[in-house]
């Protein structure tokens, strides 16, 4: 039997993008895609038909309107329709385009033909709707942090190994390798994320021994590394920090994101209590990335 999915489309002021994305994800949407046109943001999310009904969708529309009015904006337009699973698998792709990040990276949809001439390092991605497309501020902050750390690393960058904790699609591991790192350990508790990271590795033609993908967490990283990236929830990062001692050494650098600005102090305090020195905090919209190194 063919499964059906709700496709939810929200059009509102571009300043509401983060709030709309949060609301859709809280509602249960398995991935969102965003496109800006002039001063508007077009956001699309998907979730199984059986998960919600029309009354739930009407409530979502009301919440989105209330969110906007509270911030002094006009309510966004919210529409929804049912689509078949085959359409759901590809319909979101129309909203996602190549995205330049930092000075050297380019996130590139896998279904597009490769560019003939490109001075940037390509990160090819086909995440499906269950995982991010690399456009979220936290992902971009981590990618930019990787550029900085690998440019400023102690010793040859070709000797750097990186641990990617909570790897999702594996985009951060792939970026680290494209930027010159020797090896990346990509780990995630979610088996679907492990499958996605495996696909990303193959899509980018990276040898399995160079990007090692495993289900699990810090315990799957076999030895201390020179760099750590961790783009997950702040509460999870705080819980993980004590365990990072097993995979770090003096001068190991780390980039932590998935952190709201309002949560930053709690993460910084936890890091400093475990022997990390925070060097900088980068902010984008309501999110931040904490750059630190091990003393």
UniProtKB/Swiss-Prot annotation:
Gene Ontology molecular-function annotations: protein-lysine N-methyltransferase activity
HAMAP family xref list: Methyltr_PrmA (MF_00735)
Pfam families in the cross-refs: PrmA
Source organism of the structure: Cyanothece sp. (strain PCC 7425 / ATCC 29141)
Entry keyword set: Cytoplasm, Methyltransferase, S-adenosyl-L-methionine, Transferase
InterPro entries: Ribosomal_L11_MeTrfase_PrmA, Ribosomal_PrmA_MeTrfase, SAM-dependent_MTases_sf
Chief location category: cytoplasm
Assigned protein family: Belongs to the methyltransferase superfamily. PrmA family.
Subcellular location: Cytoplasm
Classification lineage: Bacteria, Bacillati, Cyanobacteriota, Cyanophyceae, Gomontiellales
Transmembrane spans: none
Residues annotated as binding S-adenosyl-L-methionine: 139, 166, 188, 231
Name recorded for this polypeptide: Ribosomal protein L11 methyltransferase
Enzyme Commission number, as recorded: 2.1.1.-
GO biological process: methylation
PANTHER family: ELECTRON TRANSFER FLAVOPROTEIN BETA SUBUNIT LYSINE METHYLTRANSFERASE
Cellular component GO terms held in the UniProt record: cytoplasm
Biological role stated in the UniProt entry: Methylates ribosomal protein L11.
Catalytic reaction equation(s): L-lysyl-[protein] + 3 S-adenosyl-L-methionine = N(6),N(6),N(6)-trimethyl-L-lysyl-[protein] + 3 S-adenosyl-L-homocysteine + 3 H(+)
Domain of life: Bacteria
Alphabetized Gene3D superfamilies for the sequence: Vaccinia Virus protein VP39 (3.40.50.150)
């Amino acid at each position: 039997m063919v499964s059906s999915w709700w496709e939810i489309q929200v059009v509102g002021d571009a300043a509401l993008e983060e709030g709309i994305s949060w609301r859709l994800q809280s509602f249960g949407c398995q991935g969102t895609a965003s496109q800006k046109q002039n001063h508007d943001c077009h956001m699309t999310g998907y979730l199984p038909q059986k998960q919600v009904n029309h009354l739930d969708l009407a409530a979502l529309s009301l919440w989105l309107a209330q969110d906007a009015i509270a911030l002094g904006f006009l309510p966004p337009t919210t529409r929804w329709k049912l689509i078949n699973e085959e359409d759901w698998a590809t319909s979101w792709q129309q909203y996602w385009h190549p995205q330049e990040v930092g000075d050297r990276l380019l996130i590139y949809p896998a279904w597009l033909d490769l560019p003939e001439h490109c001075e940037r390092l390509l990160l090819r991605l086909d995440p499906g709707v269950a995982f991010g497309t690399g456009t979220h501020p936290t992902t971009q902050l981590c990618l930019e942090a990787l550029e900085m750390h690998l440019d400023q690393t102690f010793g040859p960058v070709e000797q750097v190994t990186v641990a990617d904790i909570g790897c999702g699609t594996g985009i951060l591991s792939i970026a680290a390798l494209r930027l010159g790192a020797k090896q990346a350990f990509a780990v995630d508790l979610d088996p679907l994320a492990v499958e996605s990271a495996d696909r990303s590795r193959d899509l980018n033609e990276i040898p399995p021994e160079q990007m090692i993908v495993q289900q699990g967490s810090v315990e799957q990283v076999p030895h201390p590394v020179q760099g750590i990236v961790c783009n997950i929830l702040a509460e999870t990062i705080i819980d993980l920090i004590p365990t990072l001692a097993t995979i770090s050494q003096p001068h190991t650098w780390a980039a932590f994101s998935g952190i709201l600005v309002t949560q930053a102090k709690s993460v910084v305090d936890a890091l400093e209590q475990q022997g990390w020195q925070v060097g900088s905090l980068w902010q984008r919209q309501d999110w931040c990335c904490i750059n630190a190194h091990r003393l």
